[in-house]
Amino acid sequence: DYSAGLKTVMNLSENDNLEISYGFDQYDKARYVNDERTHDHDYTNRQNTVRALYSHIFGKNTLTVGADFLNDYLTTYQFEDNESKNQNSCDAFAQFDYNPLQWLNIVASLRHDYFSASSQHATTGRLALMTKWKGFSIRANYAGGFRAPTLKEMYMNFDMADMQMIYGNPDLKPEKSNNYNLALEHTGRVKNAGFFTGQYSLTLMGY
């Protein structure tokens, strides 16, 4: 297994920050019998990842934009004819952390994903709100989700310990989801209760 990475963080100004990173990971597997490689269990998975993240602070608010790129290469005896597969996925996103009042915080974000092994693209969003007032807090959140299938899920065909065969599905589509969450929390103190004093917290959550 080989892995390496590079990362740079640049403070462009008092309110501007840029972060760029690169990651490399390669996992190789082979089988040897009597010190000779059989080539019937060769496996190589190689991933290259690039990420850029920029943030700008103005007042109590923060704007963050970024992008990711992943190149995934896999060759394995569990593919038909020991062939290799390759795919690219990338995304771009923006997030705004807004604090208009001392007791109110709003976070809104938008993200677009591209997946080379499918004609489907996806744009997902997130909106979160939190407010606090006299020991009470309310949190409301919506988030859209996206997950692209892996090369293993699409193309691997292998025998599971002679019990069953597992077949990949090359027509597998990306997963999409919508998540909603609402929570009410109350914190307080117990005073002058005889032998008992302390703090308490009550949370009611739905999703």
Tell what function each PLM region has:
Residues 1-3, 7-11, 118, 132-133, ...:
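Outer-membrane beta-barrel signature, preferentially recognizing the C-terminal barrel domain
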